[in-house]
Curated annotation (Swiss-Prot):
Annotated tissue distribution: Red blood cells.
Protein keywords: Acetylation, Heme, Iron, Metal-binding, Oxygen transport, Transport
Additional record remark: This fish has two hemoglobins: cathodic and anodic. The cathodic Hb and anodic Hb display small and large Bohr effects respectively. In addition, the cathodic Hb displays a reverse Bohr effect and appreciable phosphate effects.
Binding-site residues, heme b: H89
Molecular-function annotations in GO: haptoglobin binding; heme binding; metal ion binding; organic acid binding; oxygen binding; oxygen carrier activity; peroxidase activity
Higher taxonomy: Eukaryota, Metazoa, Chordata, Craniata, Vertebrata
Description of how the protein assembles with itself and partners: Heterotetramer of two alpha chains and two beta chains.
Family: Belongs to the globin family.
Name this polypeptide is given: Hemoglobin cathodic subunit alpha
Amino acid sequence: MSLTAKDKSLITGFWQKISSKADDLGAEALSRMIVVFPATKVYFSHWPDLGPGSPSVKKHGKVIMAAVGDAVGKMNDLVGALSALSDLHAFKMRIDPGNFKTLSHNILVACAVNFPVDFTAEVHVAMDKFLAALGAALSDKYR
């Protein structure tokens, strides 16, 4: 599914509104994923605390959303822009690529909860398409 010019405009505009809270959104999305999908805990077993708001969750949530923000600026070549991250997740960390969809869903939930006025139906669709494309780009090295 490709992103239209309108999708890209909506994504860029929404990101500008939420970017100042991106670290918190990332921590919330990651916390939600770990709680709601406990099988994902296996990837973070080296962390001393997996609880919502823990330093490790906050730190990695920030890393995740920094990568999402970087991808917003590189929407025209997500596979190229995320090549190194795809390598890391596929070969070093061995993350099941299905988890990208799970995390994307939780990012959408965090955005909807924290930005109910700005997270319109149109923005929701555009962000869902974007995060699906981002997940597909991260899964590129798995093939």
